[in-house]
Amino acid sequence: MQPTNTRDPDYFHKVVDCQWACPAHTDVPGYIRLIAQGQYTEAFLLNRESNVFPGILGRVCDRPCEPACRRGRVEDKPVAICRLKRVAADLADDYSDRLPKAPAKKNGKRIACVGAGPASLTVANDLLPLGYEIVIVEGLQVPGGLMRSNIPSFRLPAEVLDREIDDIVGMGAQLKLGHRIESMQKLLAEGFDAIFVGTGAPKGKELKLPGRYDDGARVHIGIEWLESVAFDHIKMIGEQVLIIGVGNTALECCRSSLRLGAKSVKVMARKPRQFFKASAWELDDAEEEHVEIVVNRSPKAFVTTGGKLSGMLFDVMEYDFDARGRITAERIVREEILPADDIVLAIGQENAFPWVERDLGIEFDKWDVPKVDLKTFESTRPGVFFGGDSAFGPKNIIWAVEHGHQAAI
């Protein structure tokens, strides 16, 4: 047995299970204690030291802390760690005079952050008080990245998002909106001391099955559709909607569909419930709104009638499992057609780097994802960093925050 290295900061995080499970290692016992004492502003600021976005994460975090909570070992449910974060944010007094300030005298270093999502904003949050000049470049006309475009406002109100972004940008970041980077080479030529890429995983996966383009206007890519809804480009949908996929994006799509006028919304899952990627509380919220979760359905073809989408053909699956619950065999037992006026594809997201030239010393792996150091998030080209979903594929905001912290260091 090796002696404990108490100089390693991870040692102190591991003492508290929930704090260690949180990617940003938020001091969970500390802020819950402050809430119990009625010190909501102090609880908010303690949260902000590590997770940067207490009000946002108090609503939409994936809650990796809660399965690790020790109360879950002796009670039916863990402490509501995530919701308590929201309590602190919602009840905090004006804290603007207690936020970090950027010094008037800069240190002479210029950093470019590509994308105005949580990873880039965290980099700015950490480096602005140290005298760095931060330029955040965002293709959309508003900051926030996928927090803005893919999380519906009924879950994450715009005023909460705006307030916590303004807390960072207000320290002096230069925000260039509506400015899409077309070439990494040109960005490098601007002479920044470092570049951080936090563009997320902005490309939704396709489902290339027979009939896909027979009525393409009625078949939507999940994240693109959510963005169109967020910016009021789409204001209605058909009465019968099928959502293909059962991750968190699929659940954003199904609940948004109801608010756009759908009468029947079904989320179609290929496997049984224990294999779902979606968070249990997201599933509960959807089912409370009478969304039907249909399991063991593998999509086979889009069905059109007279050139118009009318449904989807599925293989109905059965599975065998071993003693550990793993699938050992699968078989098709029959086919089934379900009616649909619209179909939304939410089967995953991918990174997209057409703007990063491949002759700049930035190496990509077989999945076309940049190779980065797992601690610093620096790519194979010194001074160029990738973080958040752009580095490791779709995860949650709290992971993007932690990547931003580490890259800033």
Predicted regions, residues:
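Glycine-rich dinucleotide-binding loop and its adjacent helix/turn
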Residues: A88-A104, R163-S183, G204-L260, F364-K375, ...
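Ferredoxin-type iron-sulfur electron-transfer modules in oxidoreductases and energy-metabolism complexes
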Residues: M1-P9, D27-G58, E75-A102
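Feature captures the FAD/FMN-dependent oxidoreductase FAD-binding
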Residues: K105, R110-V114, D162-K208, A301-L313, ...
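FAD-site-proximal beta/loop scaffold in flavoenzymes
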Residues: D215-E239, D322-P394
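A conserved FAD-binding loop/helix module that cradles the flavin
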Residues: C253, S390-I409
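Iron-sulfur cluster-binding cysteine motifs and their immediate structural context
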Residues: F12, V16-Q37, G58-A88, V135, ...
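Rossmann-like dinucleotide-binding cores of NAD(P)H-dependent redox enzymes
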Residues: E133-K176, E227-V229, C254-A301
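N-terminal Rossmann-like FAD-binding beta1-loop-alpha1 element of flavoenzymes
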Residues: R110-V135, T249-L258
